[in-house]
């Protein structure tokens, strides 16, 4: 992130100057610096037809990932993948999400939004395991998309955790207030100011934000508003609470129309917010993805044990069919990829530095063709080994 380190090691409102902010965000994204991108629209990089060819080899994939990481860190802070998901698969997923939302409403437990007025939208919290348990085949077709793995590995490295919050903004739903995202973006200004300046610069590397369009999103439906390059403004977690900065955002944000199946991913420090749905009859649905580093903490708790068991049959079928990359992508979403925290009294590493992770266990089960009962037993045994035992008989 650009901007000088706060002189006392902590940011305060006095460090937030609009002139400095404008110097950071009022620049142009140069397509020539991103050879794998197809276009720049409103300062946002758009990727599409070039990707499959450029990622066909290990070396080519690494080059693309390095470019994506640079785009998120030092570039516009946001990238769009055109046609990232098969629209037919998206429609099947949307049916599952609508059924869950209908059940929430019938039960009187409709979910709201952090940054928008109540009643604007319908949301499913913690949708990964809900989706997998309800429709494992649809889940597998959906999360087999390589785009999530490509950019998640580029920004976070391996063993990341995907969480999901499908969100429907109804006609007339008002825009969100401009903000940054989790972690420091989910604190009030005083809480954020308690963290030292270096933490403000490091925390965006713990999370990747994404959104998959589940319907066509012309501008009148209110697709997400972005301020490209704003992730580079170091005191931004303090600044976005200021009306001076949100006012500037309101006058200079950009919106990109999206087609069903397009996906946008962005640095969580980017100033952004969902737009007003001015359409008469379009319920704008997006699957909001939050991908967390193995070194961080996700917002949603995911029952990865149940999700792994639910997908096991599908994983074995796809492995037998030679769809190995899809299986790896799905295991990265379904299972816990990091071995810690654990109870090292019980879960001791044997012949290696770390215990076996849940993702490694699931991959072994797929490769070796375990039956369902063996997987359930091994998952339960692993969970027991990982559970703290102090004070228990």
Model regions and ranges:
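Non-heme Fe(II)-dependent double-stranded beta-helix
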Residues: 15, 25-78, 82-189
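Catalytic core of Fe(II)/2-oxoglutarate
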Residues: 239-314
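Conserved catalytic-core segments centered on acid/base and nucleophilic motifs
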Residues: 152-153, 199, 209-217, 224-225, ...
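Fe(II)/2-oxoglutarate
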Residues: 1-74, 330, 338-341, 349-393
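Catalytic core of non-heme Fe(II) oxygenases with the double-stranded beta-helix
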Residues: 150-151, 176-177, 184-248, 296-310
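Flexible loop/turn segments at secondary-structure boundaries
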Residues: 87-89, 170-171, 218-220, 233-234, ...
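Extracellular structured ligand-interaction cores
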Residues: 78, 161, 205-211, 221, ...
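Short conserved micro-motifs at the rims of enzyme active sites and ligand-binding pockets
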Residues: 237-238, 276-278, 297-303, 318-327, ...
